[in-house]
């Protein structure tokens, strides 16, 4: 069953402002910070991150986000990457069209028992993820991720 969705004029204007090409803070390389700010207004989150991931080389080949944070414990990330269903889903499935959440793969109890959560995301204060992927070449993906701490899912 399809649930009807209503969109207000305010929401449409907010979405339109995201795709506007009139950004004074265009950095040349990467995305303007104002774009991240607009996305965070449309999809409330604690952090937004845009990065390139090379699963074959176990490397992040570019990255930016708000707030600007370090990469965390990348050894822990790569240790648990292939066992983490939401993290490795694009590589395992080849599906780069779906927008996914942790809750698409695990219950909260299951997620909190994973190595990825315990060793990588919990120390950063995050419980929830929303991920959009684009192809980045063989073994590579470009990811836009939204993170939230404890509380409501996306």
How would you label these PLM feature ranges?
Residues 4-153:
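Regulatory input/activation interfaces that engage signals or partners
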